[in-house]
Swiss-Prot record:
Subunit structure: In the presence of PdxS, forms a dodecamer of heterodimers. Only shows activity in the heterodimer.
Entry binding sites for L-glutamine: 52-54, 115, 143-144
UniProt xrefs under InterPro entries: Class_I_gatase-like, PdxT/SNO, PdxT/SNO_CS
Organism phylogeny: Archaea, Methanobacteriati, Methanobacteriota, Stenosarchaea group, Methanomicrobia
Name recorded for this polypeptide: Pyridoxal 5'-phosphate synthase subunit PdxT
Pfam families in UniProt: SNO (PF01174)
Organism: Methanosarcina mazei (strain ATCC BAA-159 / DSM 3647 / Goe1 / Go1 / JCM 11833 / OCM 88)
Length: 199
């Protein structure tokens, strides 16, 4: 089994490390691979789209032919986790800023996002979050973070902060406005791993 982390831009090594630690804790044998070009996504049982700069990420995913592969994987039910910029990339609709930059979003989650929901006013901060899938609060690390403004009926809201949706799930797709890979708390990566193992 392979779990792939999109590695063309963004916080890659932290996700790779968190996934490897989560696998070890679960006692599961699997390979965590970095996806830098076309052809790797179809081999993966789970895909992580990390943070970074969403405009650049969208452009590189399209240019490298990875965007279409992710859409196909999502349609087949492969679990996908998008964090921070990844939350923007997987959305169906962006705000005016996203539209202005001409970002081609993957549209695999029925959400409308605000690219700089927590960004301009406070560049980075931590907040204790109540997350529906966890039994105790999770420390969310927010770095110029986006947020989900609205979502379709098939999307389950998992957490809110200041009225903004910061975690959501739609079937096999999980979106987070924060960076779980920047904490020592592996519960969200373990939850994602369970989705991979059960799909």
């Amino acid at each position: 089994m392979k779990i792939g982390v999109i590695a063309i831009q963004g916080a890659v090594s932290e996700h790779v490390d968190a996934l490897r630690r989560a696998l070890k804790e679960r006692g599961v044998e699997a390979e965590v691979v970095e996806i830098k070009h076309k052809g790797i996504v179809p081999e993966c049982s789970g895909i992580v789209i990390p943070g970074g700069e969403s405009t650049t990420l969208c452009r590189l995913l399209a240019r490298e032919g990875i965007a279409e592969e992710i859409k196909e994987a999502a349609a087949k039910g492969v679990p996908i986790l998008g964090t921070c910029a990844g939350l923007i990339v997987i959305a169906k609709e962006g705000d005016r800023q996203v539209e202005k930059t001409g970002q081609e979003l993957l549209g695999i989650m029925d959400t409308r996002v605000n690219r700089n929901a927590f960004g301009r006013q406070r560049d980075s901060f931590e907040a204790e979050l109540e997350v529906f899938i966890l039994d105790s609060p999770f420390t969310g690390v927010f770095i110029r973070a986006p947020g989900i403004v609205s979502c379709g009926p098939g999307v389950k809201v998992l957490s809110r902060l200041e009225g903004m949706i910061v975690a959501a799930e739609q079937g096999n797709v999980l979106a987070l406005a924060f960076h779980p890979e920047l904490t020592d708390d592996l519960r969200i990566h373990q939850y994602f791993l369970d989705k991979v193992l059960n799909c």
